[in-house]
Amino acid sequence: TVQVVSPSVWGWRENRIKDIESHVDLTMCLFKFECNFYASKNMNSFFLGHPFSKLQMGDKNAILSKHGLEDSKDFVSILPGSRRSEISQLMPIYIQSAKKLLEVNPNIFFLIPAANSELADAIASHQDINQIPHSLATEAAQDFLSISTISIVTSGTASLEAAVLGSVPIICYKTNAFNYAILSRMVKTPFIGLPNLLLQEHVFPELIQQDLSVDAIVSSYSEISSKPQRYQSHLAAMNDSMNGEGFTAAAQAIKHLL
């Protein structure tokens, strides 16, 4: 049996590894650190690579024209999440942070992609959103991230997408105290952001629970802005780490099992 895409046993509910060991002969992994985890358990795995490694930054001029944006602005993307609960919890903090960031850099223009029209409406309904210069659009994440040097991102695959497209992510997460108490006991990794997990180093800011505040977001923005080359080199290293052995080699690995 070949398992395509490993469950996140390296991060939480590690006891599931027993079922995988009993029923799976080879696991195809999206990330190299997953292969290292399986090797530590004396289990077979193959580094396929992540589909995001194929993402390409869009053409800036085409994106500006498509969305009616001015080239002179400093773009910062805000990705508040793909669930209404995340948007409800985090969007007020993001809007207040955006106001504060405009005091630091009045030339910022905020780009807010939404996964669908329902989530766009949820974002647009938030108080004070019209007090910040912004563009809110559906199905625009890749466009917006391609032209944003920095992004404020709710933790999840969006943080990886941002990093791949050259936008340094400020990774944020907050939930209610009960949920956090459960999650913090289950999660076994030192980082929650995929970009940091890939680098195995705390490179990109992670503002989690009580550490998430307006001041923390502004401080993270200032830190990243002051060292652009350092962060871009980390993005390049992260992107390199995502290139797996590919489908042809994967087919050969499967053939050897037969």
Question: Where do the protein language model's features map onto the residues?
Answer:
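Nucleotide-activated sugar donor-binding and catalytic core shared by glycosyltransferases
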Residues: 1-258
